[in-house]
């Protein structure tokens, strides 16, 4: 199972809001909704977030052994 809770902490540490992701960085509300609900997103989305936040995938998601 995907857990995007590290993303919200990283965004807070970098001073970037979800609103800014939508307005300034062209993220769709659907993508943010998927992240909020711990659903799958594309590797491209993970890459874009890593480049934007200057971080690694470990800073935005963790994978657990819990069933989806």
What positions do the PLM features span?
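A short, Lys/Arg-rich alpha-helix, primarily the initiator
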Residues: 1-19
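Short, charged recognition helix plus adjacent turn
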Residues: 9-13, 62-68
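Hydrophobic micro-packing sites on short alpha-helices
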Residues: 45-50, 60-61
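Short alpha-helical DNA-recognition segment
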Residues: 15-33
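The alpha-helix within a helix-turn-helix
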Residues: 11, 22, 50
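Helix-turn-helix DNA-binding elements, focusing on the entry/boundary residues of the two helices
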Residues: 18, 43-46
């Amino acid at each position: 199972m995907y857990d995007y809770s590290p993303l919200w902490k990283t965004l807070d540490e970098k001073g970037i809001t979800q609103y800014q992701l939508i307005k300034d960085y062209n993220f769709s509300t659907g993508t943010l909704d998927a992240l909020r609900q711990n659903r799958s997103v594309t590797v491209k989305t993970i890459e874009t977030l890593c480049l934007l936040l200057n971080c690694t995938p470990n800073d935005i998601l963790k994978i657990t052994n819990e069933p989806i």
